[in-house]
Design a protein with these regions (language model features):
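An N-terminal hydrophobic leader/cap segment in hydrolases
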Residues: 14, 18-65
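Short alpha-helix in the alpha/beta-hydrolase fold that links the catalytic acid
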Residues: 104-105, 217, 245-254, 276
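Alpha/beta-hydrolase fold nucleophile elbow
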Residues: 153-168
């Protein structure tokens, strides 16, 4: 006659099954984060009809082809129609925005001598391909080279005029770009310290090491300082930012005292763009 298993054995089996289930669940979470991390970082979308009239009348598309597909950036020349802008601002958006969103943020820009090059991530807007750090570097460099050719200028002509501005992930791209060029000014809005440390805030420190690639703003700022000690950097960060905490912006400013830091009271991650609009524009022209 079959005898039921003693209670301690049944309990042990239950514990083992529970541990196996927890382990499998954890492995599933790890696999999900590892294989889906790109879609967690980048949120590409095309331009919808509402953007049809956004590019100013004097603006133009800058198209170029890279190994990963056709790319399209946007150039807004200086309003004085001079061939050489006093400053060329290269703008990079957040991971949920598009390059042409800068046209709203920069509305009413007072300096008619400045020009803007608005660059989308690969797979965003009118761009093909796949967004990675390497692909974005290639795309932004190619956009600048194509613009220089269109204007009949050399890199030496543009170098003393280059500035960058970026928001959120775009601030890391702006700093990364500045670390590879002789930039005069950088505006970083809502920056993280490193993408890995930002990921740790969301998924925890151990899981953040699953990140395949990570922008490192500390490293970029260090390189900017080496490349051009006279470069000016400003950080604008909302004190109510729940996406990238303001402590990260403050930490960068503490580590690099030459950075000008502006805390925007009560502003959240996106609201900082409108609430600090006038201060940002003023600093860009100061």
């Amino acid at each position: 006659m079959h005898q039921p298993a003693p209670r301690p054995i049944r309990l042990t089996r239950a514990v083992v099954c529970a541990l196996v289930a927890i382990g499998l669940g954890f492995l599933g979470l790890v696999a999900l984060i590892y294989f889906k991390q790109h879609s967690m970082i980048y949120h590409p979308r095309p331009y919808d009809p509402s953007y049809a009239q956004v590019l100013p009348a004097n603006g133009e598309e800058i198209s170029y082809t890279l190994p990963f597909g056709k790319q399209t950036a946007f150039y807004i020349p200086a309003r004085d129609n001079g061939r050489l802008p006093a400053r060329l601002w290269i703008a990079f958006c957040g991971n949920g925005s598009l390059a042409l969103d800068w046209t709203t943020i920069l509305a009413g820009y007072p300096n008619s001598d400045d020009a803007f090059l608005l660059v989308d991530y690969p797979s965003y807007g009118k761009c093909q391909g796949y967004a990675t750090i390497a692909n974005m570097r290639a795309s932004s460099d190619a956009a600048l080279d194509m613009l220089a050719k269109r204007l009949g200028l050399s890199g030496e002509d543009l170098d003393p005029r280059l500035c960058t501005i970026g928001h959120s992930l775009g601030s890391a791209v702006a700093l990364d770009f500045a670390a590879r060029h002789r930039i005069q000014r950088v505006v970083a809005i809502s920056p993280f310290t490193t993408l890995r440390e930002e990921a740790a805030c969301i998924i925890g420190g151990p899981l953040s090491h699953l990140l395949i690639e990570s922008y490192d703003n500390r490293s970029s700022i260090t390189e900017i300082r080496k490349r051009n000690p006279e470069a000016k950097i400003a950080i604008f960060h909302g004190t109510d930012d729940k996406v990238i905490p303001v402590r990260m912006g403050r930490e960068l400013a503490r580590e690099f005292p030459f950075i000008e830091f502006f805390a925007v009271d009560g502003a959240n991650h996106v609201g900082v763009l409108s609430e600090a609009h006038d201060k940002i524009i003023h600093w860009m022209n100061n």
